C-alpha cells in the first residue's frame, strides 16, 4: 500500500506547481502521481509547465490525460468555450506553444480524457471531466451523472473545486450487504482555483488507510501576475487573486 499525489488543472502556472512540488517533498514517500489534465492555457507559462512535467518532474507519472484545454487547442476546436475571452486565451496559447510542448501533448499524454488503471488492487478511473463528457462536464457531490459502479476510486478534475465523497451502489455482494462503495476525489486546481481559496490545491491518497489529504499551498501570486501577456484578458489575472 502506498501514497499517491493527484494533480489537476495547472493551467500554465509554473510558480504554483513548483510550490506544490515543494509541499509534496514534505509528505513522506510518494509512489506516483496522477495527472488529470489542463496543464496549459489561462496562465502565462504553458511551455514551462510542460517542460517541467516532461524533463524535471521528480515523481513517476502513473496517469497522464488531456483536459478540455489540451483537446481544444490541439484539435483547434474552440466551440465548447463559454466566452469569447476563453476562445481568445486558447488561441493565443496555441500560438506560443513550442514544438517540444506540442510533441509532448501529442505523444506522451492520453488523448481520450480518461484512463482506467489499478492502484494496489483497487480499480480506478481517472477522467478530466466525467463520464457524461470526458472533457466538459464535471462531477459534483450528489451530481455524478454516469455509472461509476465498476470502480473503487474515481479521480476527476475540470471543475476547479476540490471534493472528496463516497457513493454506494447496489451490488451482488451479501458480505457487504449488497453495496459497493466508490470514493470520488477531485484535487481542485493547482493553477486557477475557483472555490474561494486562492492557494494551489492538490490531494494525496494513502491506499493503506484510504485517507485523502486535501492540500492547500500558498504561492507567490504577484510573481505570476507579472508574467502575463497583454493578450490575455485581465479576468484571468483576477481569478488568481480572488480564487473564484
Task: Give residue ranges: language-model regions.
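Core catalytic region of metal-dependent phosphoesterases/phosphodiesterases
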Residues: 2-7, 12-102, 106
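Acidic, His/Gly-rich catalytic cores of divalent-metal-dependent hydrolytic chemistry
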Residues: 170-244
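Active-site neighborhood of phospho(di)ester-bond hydrolases with catalytic His/Asp-centered motifs
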Residues: 7-8, 33-37, 63-68, 127, ...
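Beta-strand-turn-beta hairpins that frame and shape the catalytic cleft
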Residues: 1-5, 116-125, 178-182
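Active-site-proximal loop/helix segment associated with metal-binding centers of metalloenzymes
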Residues: 97, 110, 124, 129-141, ...
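Active-site environment of divalent metal-dependent phosphoester hydrolases
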Residues: 11-16, 41-44, 69-74, 132-134, ...
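Active-site-proximal segments of metal-dependent phosphoesterases and phosphodiesterases across multiple
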Residues: 81-87, 120-149, 169
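Short beta-strand scaffold segments in enzyme catalytic cores
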Residues: 112-117, 162-166, 201-205
Amino acid at each position: 500500500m502506498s501514497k499517491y499525489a493527484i494533480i489537476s488543472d495547472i493551467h500554465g502556472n509554473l510558480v504554483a506547481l513548483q510550490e506544490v512540488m515543494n509541499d509534496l517533498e514534505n509528505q513522506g514517500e510518494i509512489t506516483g502521481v496522477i495527472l488529470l489534465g489542463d496543464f496549459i492555457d489561462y496562465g502565462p507559462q504553458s511551455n514551462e509547465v510542460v517542460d517541467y512535467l516532461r524533463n524535471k518532474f521528480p515523481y513517476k507519472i502513473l496517469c497522464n490525460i488531456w483536459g478540455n484545454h489540451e483537446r481544444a487547442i490541439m484539435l483547434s476546436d474552440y466551440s465548447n468555450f463559454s466566452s469569447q475571452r476563453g476562445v481568445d486565451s486558447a488561441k493565443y496559447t496555441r500560438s506560443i506553444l513550442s514544438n517540444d510542448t506540442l510533441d509532448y501533448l501529442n505523444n506522451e499524454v492520453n488523448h481520450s480524457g480518461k484512463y482506467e488503471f489499478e492502484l494496489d488492487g483497487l480499480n480506478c478511473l481517472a477522467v478530466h471531466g466525467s463520464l457524461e463528457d470526458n472533457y466538459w462536464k464535471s462531477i459534483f457531490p450528489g451530481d455524478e451523472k454516469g455509472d461509476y459502479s465498476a470502480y473503487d476510486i474515481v479521480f476527476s478534475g475540470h471543475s476547479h473545486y476540490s471534493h472528496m465523497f463516497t457513493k454506494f451502489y447496489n451490488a451482488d455482494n451479501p458480505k457487504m450487504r449488497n453495496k459497493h462503495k466508490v470514493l470520488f476525489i477531485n484535487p481542485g486546481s493547482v493553477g486557477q482555483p475557483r472555490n474561494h481559496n486562492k492557494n494551489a490545491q492538490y490531494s494525496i491518497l494513502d491506499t493503506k488507510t484510504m485517507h485523502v489529504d486535501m492540500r492547500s499551498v500558498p504561492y507567490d501570486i504577484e510573481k505570476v501576475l507579472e508574467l502575463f501577456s497583454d493578450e490575455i484578458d485581465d479576468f484571468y489575472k483576477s481569478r488568481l487573486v480572488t480564487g473564484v
